[in-house]
Amino acid sequence: MRSQPSPGWRDGIDAAPWAPSATRDALRLRAWLNRLVREFFHARQVLEVETPILSAAGNTEPNIDGFQTRFSGHVDAGTPLRWLRTSPEYPLKRLLAAGVGDCYELGRVFRNGEAGGRHNPEFTMLEWYRVGWDHLRLADEAVELVQQALSLVGRNAEVVSTTYRELFVQDAGVDPFTASDEKLQAPLREFGIEGEGLSRDDWLDLLMTHRIQPDFPADRITVVHDWPASQCALAKIRQPVAGSGEPAVAERFELYLGRFELANGYHELTDAAEQRARFLSDNRVRAGRGAVQPPLDEHLLAALAAGLPDCAGVALGIERLLMAMLGTERIAEVLAFDFARA
């Protein structure tokens, strides 16, 4: 997919500060990927929608920080303090509750706190929802989309699907549900991690990012499903059969291409009271860390109370997918202008 640069084009991240951080080829690939995404969902009769980027509510997830801004004009309805969305999830669910059916959005989202390497505060997210599906069926569709994307660069990938428990036992030698905290920490000693204040889930995340994920083969799509209930986020929790001795699990999956985490999907929680409790729990964690506690999304909670249909949803990072397709570790190489050049 080589193309001839136009006169004056400064190609790539090492060019002058005013010039693009991506090559022309990378920008073309992004355009082709956007077209592929839209054709993929058009063929499946999934409706493209656009939802607000500014919201009166923020994301309470303890490990995600949002940007705040203030409207300077006259406002009769609602607070002038607004949040840039970290995902389109909440308004998309409101559309689902209103009866829009299967839908997706391809648009910009914003997350505060990290820039450089694999991260940019502004990036593109693809998020879609399927009514009547669970997380496993949606994972299959996400795999199909990634495989089609790989065809744009003449690549293909084998697919491995595993439970969270199977993955940790096989690749780290520990059972994530029953191992002691000491056993979880043992494989990470060589990294010299300061453990003060880290929770069990933090150690599990570190095992994934430091010991397991780096060994995923570059030409393999790995789907990891049925996560610990403590990492449920906005997913349903499946209780075990009585007397089975099995743990409760979150009906959630993550999808990786090589070492790149691309997508995070849920069999969506539909219970408004439980969702409110999770939001409040998130904000208690944030308060303990001295972090901002965003206002809850009361519109979402009202939509859940009105009736969110049984559905599954997934968010996929477009830049991460492009990076994995091109084999680069720098997000700047797939952005016209990264944060430093914006």
Where do the model's predicted regions map?
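Short, charged, low-complexity patches
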Residues: R30, H135-A139, A272
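A translation/RNA-centric and nucleic-acid-associated enzymatic feature enriched
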Residues: L36, T51-A57, P62-L95, Y104-V131, ...
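Short aromatic/hydrophobic-glycine micro-motifs
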Residues: V46-L47, R155, A172-V174, I193
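Acidic, low-complexity central loop/insert segments
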Residues: D134-V160
